[in-house]
Amino acid sequence: MKKLIEAALPLTDINAKTIREKKLAPGHPAHLHLWWGRSPISSVQSALAASLIDAPESDEELKSRLARVQSREVPEFGKKPTILDPFCGFGGVALAAQSLGLPAVASDLNSVAVMLTKAATEIPAKFANVSPVNHSALRKQYFGTEGLAEDVAYYGNLLREKAWEKLKDIYPNEQEGTPSAWIWARTVKCPNPACGCTMPLASSFILCSKGTNEIWAEPVLQDGAVHFELQHGCCPKEKMSNKVGSQGAVFRCPACGSLTTDAYVKQMGSSHKLGAQMMAISLETEDGIKYIAPSEKQMHAANVPIPEDAPPGEIPDNPHWFTPPGFGLKNYADLFSSRQLTMLTMFCDLLPEIQDKAASDALAAGMDASGGSLSNGGTGALAYGQAIGVYLAFVIDKIADANSTICSWRITGNSLRNTFGRQAIPMVWTYAEGNPFSKITGNLSSTLKSVVNAIRNLPIGSEVSVLQQDARMATYPQNIMVCTELPYYKAIGYAALSDYFYIWLRKSLKTIYPELFNPMVTSKDELSTCGQYEGKHAAECEQTYEVQMRDVLAQLAEHADRNFPQLFFFEFHKGDELALVNGNNGTASPFETLIGSMLHAGYEITAVWPMRNAAASEKADGTRVLIAARVHDKTEQTTRRGFAAALKREFPMVFERMLCAGVDVSDEKIVGIGAGLSLFTRYKKVLNASGSDMKIHDALELIYQEILGYLKEKNADSEADTVQLEEE
């Protein structure tokens, strides 16, 4: 039976909700932990609902069923399909399935992705409707994840109290207030032998800017050394920074005027001769934020030894995503100051004590004493204490994101930027070291609150099983309905980027999930990892990806439930459309390659829908699309001429119906490609006059011409109607 997603979708409404979701209101599950390229829950919910609702025969009934998609109403029927997401990432698909009451199996090779998905779906279901076990809980009845959230808040505050007692000496207050941040500049020895002073490498000396009222740290030479004096007013342009140009590590020495070269700074960094100097301190006072010059007390407090148990982990030598290794910062621990390392390792080291306290309280509250550990499926007191530990480990990870030497300072907001402002780790020259016990961005209290609010809103509607497995070698249950974001090998370096968090999760959670966190770093042998950025040729990477993706799709097809469409999200790039306009020079575009792999695996494309994460923009390179496909044993074949005739005859009606529920003009062509592919891929073969198989590119070119013709006629009719109305 044809499903609604294969006929029409209220696309404008769905995309508007998805774009609103991207703003991440407090309590959104994404606040549990950072992940890149998340599956928006709202659009997946709509796609799943539309895949379960039968397509109607009448236009009147179509309106009714489209309304059910907008309200995400799942039809009641016997056995519900099991949703499979073999590239689960953050767990957005599993969350969407769970909220609709659909059972799901989610898996990923990446340990961080598996842990996030377990925490978002699997763990809350284990402890649904439990009452808090801490002694300060006031209510008697709790629903959903309310009790779990309240306990995470309680034991998180206990972690903060214990950590403060251990760390207060290295985070001293001033008489006027509490330091919220210490602002630093990296340093290097001046390359001029006649000077040789320790010079700052400051991308900005400005600390605060409100119109023409600015505060800046001015480097001053005294007794052969550079120190900083704070100035107020309008900072002269030449004093805003000693960075020269926009490219490379070129800085001017404030003492002698000599310039560094990028090569010199990299050489000094590789010799472990990069340092850092405190420029200023941001204070929280009764009158607001105030800036003061560094004091001996504050500089002494920051000068702590690197902890011996700092987590190991080497940063990949991959300048596409990581700039710091080129300057000698080759390990993840090198991205943190010694005080930041001390603070983060202390949080991790205190976690077992907090878990034991939570488990002891759970036992006293009546939880089962013999339930086993969390990793073995336990649901008793031990597992509950460990679950608290998982969410507090996420709090520590989020603090690590806001507390590294990659965090720059916002001069207009008196706050710091997180490490991951984008999907890479750049080199930062002027950085801010936040105080986790203050009110600054990324402090422990506000971070804990954001995680707790996210837990409160997690669904517990159905069973979700989360596994660590490689999609290329996994075994899947029969009769599954696939819904997944297909990775593209040149998009995001998930494995490499996630190691930044993995090293801290491993330190926090290895005793709870020993197998998941056994390796020193995450596996880099995955579909989304591009060897091109590690020295391999682009053609070799592309071929490897294509072969492996084809095998994965074939494996999924073998286990697909043929009663339902299978759903694949993918990135459709401008280059994919340009290949249809200008030709592809004999090289298949990524979209063509994917369609080819799907046909090879036995799929029939039934629709392609633009499922946007952001509003349409000329600057955007790609559009997230949803490909709906069926697994069929196709027997019918036709000729190129026969396909062209079918396209002329059937395409307008199919395309018109797909557009009827509301599709933005910017999305019409992609929807048309789906309509055309539904006609092309229903055949086992389409043969050229020579007897050879018709190429997908050739079919897409024919489809594209039909789309342009249809839209031209549609727009002409619309203009004619407008003229007629004006005349009347």
Please state what every model-predicted region is:
Residues 86, 107, 484:
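Conserved beta-strand/loop positions that form the S-adenosyl-L-methionine
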Residues 565-570:
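Short beta-strand segments at enzyme active-site cores
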Residues 540-547, 574:
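Extended, compositionally biased non-globular segments
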Residues 546-564, 596, 600:
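A short glycine-rich, Lys/Arg-flanked "PGG" loop and its adjoining helix->strand segment in the class I
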Residues 545, 582-583:
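A generic structural signal for short
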Residues 90:
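Conserved SAM/SAH-binding loop
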Residues 483-491:
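A short SAM/SAH-binding and catalytic strip from SAM-dependent methyltransferases
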Residues 1-83, 94, 98-479, 491-538, ...:
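Nucleic-acid modification enzymes, centered on SAM-dependent nucleic-acid methyltransferases
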